[in-house]
Amino acid sequence: MSTKDTNDVKPTSSKSNEISSSGTATPKKTSSVPAKEDRKDTTKKDIANERTSSSKSKDDSEKYVELKNKLIQQILKKQELTRKLTTLEDSIYQKEIDYFEESPLGNIVKGFENFSKTSGGGGANKRKIVYSEDDHIFSLSSVNYIKSLMKRQGHTSNGGSSKDDFDDYEDSVDPTTASAGSKANSIEKNETPSGSSGTPSRKRKARVLED
């Protein structure tokens, strides 16, 4: 055999190794393990995502605390205004009582019929002047007073029973979360009357005057 014929002969050992004893070809196995560079890039992305999520959670927590403190201050302010309003309404109610008692001969609410009877024959001309809640015309101009009057009569603004009246629920704050917690508690005590269901403690007896 010449040198040329020897060079033309191709090795077939590798191909024969891929053929099994049964005569079927065995497929080549490919590696599924990612390269080191790919694993490194994936790790960096995971770390970046974790940092972004942690930063967002921290911002949300700070915003929640800020809104909570702001709400506490607003509730305390509302309670203080409610206390002042209740004190003012009590003062108006008492002034109406004083006016009724100081005008036995008549007033702008009941009229002035007794003026014509002052020179008459004594007891025959006397009559009793009875005042009711409807005579408190100034107090009736207050929305809060009307609500308290409806509650005393067994009615509520939403048409349901007294237990369904959600206006009775007072705003409150946890004293441990606010520096003014003790102040809030004192305000709630002033707003809550004794022996009544959320209404100011006022005298409700009918007043009788004689001329």
From Swiss-Prot:
Keyword DNA damage assigned: yes
Xref: InterPro entries: Eaf6 (IPR015418)
Span list, region Disordered: 1-64, 152-211
Signal peptide: none
A GO cellular component entry from the record: nucleus
Biased composition regions of type Basic residues, renumbered to the chain: 201-211
Major localization class: nucleus
Compartment(s): Nucleus
Composition skew (Basic and acidic residues), residue ranges: 35-49
Superkingdom of the organism of origin: Eukaryota
Compositionally skewed regions (Polar residues) per UniProt: 9-33, 174-185
Keywords: Chromatin regulator, Coiled coil, DNA damage, DNA repair, Nucleus, Transcription, Transcription regulation
Single Gene Ontology BP annotation: DNA repair
Family as reported in the entry's similarity comment: Belongs to the EAF6 family.
The protein's assembly and partners: Component of the NuA4 histone acetyltransferase complex.
Name of the protein this chain belongs to: Chromatin modification-related protein EAF6
Source organism of this protein record: Candida albicans (strain SC5314 / ATCC MYA-2876)
